[in-house]
């Protein structure tokens, strides 16, 4: 099994853009991937405002991010998820405030953007016919796989539950209670 995360995709996307300074609302893996890609993390005149997952978001971060975006920094989101397990605010919720204040929408690199699927397949030198996408969110993970023609696995240990499937026009290829129980990979 090979994994390609939204943090990896964000760094790969940004390597192809002009500018190497970023104001980051995020933690761990995202910051690590950005450093590996040669970015400087700063709150002085950044080229990008990058929003990922964090549990330490505060008003000062929102103010800085919105100010930088309103003044020309390119606004990037790792994903559009509004909340995660336990209903904690996620990237999409954090971006909503920045968007309202700055008047600019983020470019979403992660699922359901087709960009992450193409980048993942290229990075892994894989083909859609032999690739499975695993996720806990019908609106992002499973939608991305469906749109890319991939087999999909919905795990019920996160955002989406069995009842949610009936609300969508598409269906996952397989459904498992958790990642630990997947036996097709």
What are these regions (language model features)?
Residues 1-185:
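Asp-based, Mg2+/Mn2+-dependent phosphohydrolase catalytic module
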């Amino acid at each position: 099994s090979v994994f390609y995360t939204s943090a990896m995709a964000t760094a790969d996307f940004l390597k192809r853009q002009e500018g190497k300074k970023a104001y980051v609302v995020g933690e761990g893996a995202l910051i690590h991937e950005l450093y590996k890609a040669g970015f400087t993390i700063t709150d002085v005149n950044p080229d990008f405002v990058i929003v990922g997952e964090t549990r330490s978001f505060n008003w000062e971060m929102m103010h800085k991010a919105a100010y930088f975006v309103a003044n020309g920094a390119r606004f990037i989101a790792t994903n559009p998820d509004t909340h995660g397990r336990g209903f904690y605010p996620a990237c999409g919720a954090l971006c909503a405030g920045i968007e309202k204040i700055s008047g600019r929408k983020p470019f979403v690199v992660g699922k359901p953007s087709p960009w992450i699927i193409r980048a993942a397949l290229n990075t892994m030198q894989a083909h859609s016919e032999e690739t499975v996408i695993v996720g806990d969110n019908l609106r992002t993970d499973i939608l991305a796989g469906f749109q890319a023609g991939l087999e999909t696995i919905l795990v019920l240990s996160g955002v989406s539950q069995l009842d949610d499937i009936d609300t969508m026009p598409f269906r996952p290829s397989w459904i498992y209670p958790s990642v630990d129980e997947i036996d097709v990979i």
